[in-house]
Amino acid sequence: MSLPAGNAVGNWLLILTAIFGFLTLIWIPQASAECQTRSIYCYECDSWTDARCKDPFNYTALPRDQPPLMTCNGCCVKMVRHQRSRYEVVRRMCTSQLQINLFMVDHVCMMESSGNGHMCFCEEDMCNSSKNLYTKNGYQHLINIMIIWLIGILLNQLSNR
């Protein structure tokens, strides 16, 4: 395939950017706009009263040796207070137990203004067992945007020749 010369390269750049942008928008729903309505399982515990709830979480332990699971019609939540101190408290639960009026997005964490804690949301079975709720899929969007940006630079350089 040969590239057209001059102004047509700019048109190709615009078309390719639109195609990749559209494909990226198709992939973004994987991050779900709001907590889902289907039922998932979330861990329900507080490290203040249950040492099994602490990080690092032992997700390889037998189910009887893990904190209880509950059915959740929303997102799983993991809250950490007094992060990286001997007073650290980890709480794992479902959004149905929170009175929160925020637009919640899957695999999003909100930090305390002091930087000593955070609250993360996720929507897969037992996802609130993770130390870090960001998944590889969360970084996929950044990688896609970087690829689109690099292709745009390459096409721009080709059009300037």
Swiss-Prot record:
N-glycosylated probably on Asn-58. A lipid is attached at N128 (GPI-anchor amidated asparagine). GO terms for molecular function: acetylcholine receptor inhibitor activity; GPI anchor binding; potassium channel activator activity. This is UPAR/Ly6 domain-containing protein qvr. Expressed in mushroom body (at protein level); overlaps with expression of Sh/shaker and nicotinic acetylcholine receptor (nAChR) components also involved in sleep regulation. Expressed in the adult brain and head. Enriched in the mushroom body, anterior optic tubercle, superior protocerebrum, antennal nerve and visual projection neuron fibers projecting into the lobula plate of the optic lobe. It comes from Drosophila willistoni (Fruit fly). Residues 1-33 form the signal peptide. InterPro entries: QVR-like, Sleep_regulator. It comes from the Eukaryota. Bifunctional regulator of neuronal activity in the mushroom body, and possibly other regions of the brain, that acts as a signaling molecule required for homeostatic regulation of sleep under normal conditions and after sleep deprivation. Reduces neuronal excitability by enhancing Sh/shaker K(+) channel activity; possibly by stabilizing Sh/shaker to increase protein levels, accelerating its activation kinetics, slowing C-type inactivation and enhancing recovery from inactivation. Specifically affects the A-type K(+) current. The chain crosses the membrane at residues 138-158. Residues 78-92 are annotated as: Loop 2. The keyword Signal applies. One of its GO terms (biological process) is sleep. It is a lipid-anchor; GPI-anchor. Belongs to the quiver family. Pfam families: QVR (PF17064). The keyword Cell membrane applies. CDD domains: TFP_LU_ECD_Qvr. GO terms for cellular component: external side of plasma membrane; membrane raft; plasma membrane.
